Amino acid sequence: MSLDNLTIASRYSKALFELAVEKDQTEAFLAELKQLRQVFVDNPQLAEVLSGSLLPVDQKQTTLSTLTDHASEYIKNFIQMLYDYGRMSNLVGIVDAFEARFDESRKIVHAEVTSAVKLSDEQADAIAKAFAKRVGANQVVLSRKVDEAIIGGVIVKSNNQTFDGSVALQLTNLRRALINN
């Protein structure tokens, strides 16, 4: 019975996160894992090469050693285990799941803010602080998007929730109220 990618990512990230907490190394593990993830994102064929039969085992091991050259022993062992169990293609998903666990443990929320004009850093910081207070987060990491169609105000999306404070929505609601009355 094969496991789906989400289950694999969840199990491996949970085990690694528990080790990171035990060793008080969550930030260090995350930093190392993010670097490795970026290598695999930038080189999508790398996981296939390490999983496939194109390269001899000794060349794969050399590649793994090069990849983890500056990593801690824990991360080296983790990557070696993924290789040994044929899970290199799951590395990006595992790191994503590890980062989600890290964020959850620190009450860090990622959100996208849409505005009609480009927000200044001060405006974005104010929105992040207000949103953090509203959702009970310690920190909000905002990505910004401009959409002139909202006319004014902002729309903040996070974790399948949308907080719409746009002028476009207010006009739509006003129009509906006028039509219904």
UniProtKB/Swiss-Prot annotation:
It comes from the Bacteria. Keywords: ATP synthesis, Cell membrane, CF(1), Hydrogen ion transport, Ion transport, Membrane, Transport. One of its GO terms (cellular component) is proton-transporting ATP synthase complex. Its main location: membrane. Belongs to the ATPase delta chain family. HAMAP family: ATP_synth_delta_bact (MF_01416). F(1)F(0) ATP synthase produces ATP from ADP in the presence of a proton or sodium gradient. F-type ATPases consist of two structural domains, F(1) containing the extramembraneous catalytic core and F(0) containing the membrane proton channel, linked together by a central stalk and a peripheral stalk. During catalysis, ATP synthesis in the catalytic domain of F(1) is coupled via a rotary mechanism of the central stalk subunits to proton translocation. This protein is part of the stalk that links CF(0) to CF(1). It either transmits conformational changes from CF(0) to CF(1) or is implicated in proton conduction. NCBIfam families: ATP_synt_delta, PRK05758.2-1. F-type ATPases have 2 components, F(1) - the catalytic core - and F(0) - the membrane proton channel. F(1) has five subunits: alpha(3), beta(3), gamma(1), delta(1), epsilon(1). F(0) has three main subunits: a(1), b(2) and c(10-14). The alpha and beta chains form an alternating ring which encloses part of the gamma chain. F(1) is attached to F(0) by a central stalk formed by the gamma and epsilon chains, while a peripheral stalk is formed by the delta and b chains. This is ATP synthase subunit delta. It comes from Lactiplantibacillus plantarum (strain ATCC BAA-793 / NCIMB 8826 / WCFS1).
